[in-house]
Amino acid sequence: MADVTKDDVVEFIANMSVLELSELVKELEEKFGVSAAAPVAMMAAGGAADAGAAAEEQTEFDVILEAAGDKKIGVIKEVRAITGLGLKEAKALVDEAPKPVKEGIVKEEAEKIKAQLEAAGAQVSVK
């Protein structure tokens, strides 16, 4: 291998786009037969085991759009802002309610999104 230092590698990675980084991670996972998500799952499972089985608390929540209500356009705008979906996709999500808007998020974020959607006139639940 040439004279490539760790600093050179870090600098190279720092200049990559998000798409390039994603592709790099996938290639590294394939080359070494590992998954970047595995350590996170193991740490979460380990943390739950340390806390004990007595009080098992839900850590991931789903925000479900139950109904759009009377202010459908406002709800579509909020769904677009929250999810980053295009107009067509956001309208389809609102039309097909009940549908999840966001899944697997922390409670604080779920409550914030619920409040945003309710302010726009939607009926929302957090599960």
Swiss-Prot record:
The keyword Manganese does not apply. It holds the Pfam family Ribosomal_L12. InterPro entries: Ribosomal_bL12 (IPR000206), Ribosomal_bL12_C (IPR013823), Ribosomal_bL12_C/ClpS-like (IPR014719), Ribosomal_bL12_oligo (IPR008932), Ribosomal_bL12_oligo_N_sf (IPR036235). One of its GO terms (molecular function) is mRNA binding. Keywords: Ribonucleoprotein, Ribosomal protein. Belongs to the bacterial ribosomal protein bL12 family. Forms part of the ribosomal stalk which helps the ribosome interact with GTP-bound translation factors. Is thus essential for accurate translation. This is Large ribosomal subunit protein bL12. The gene is rplL.
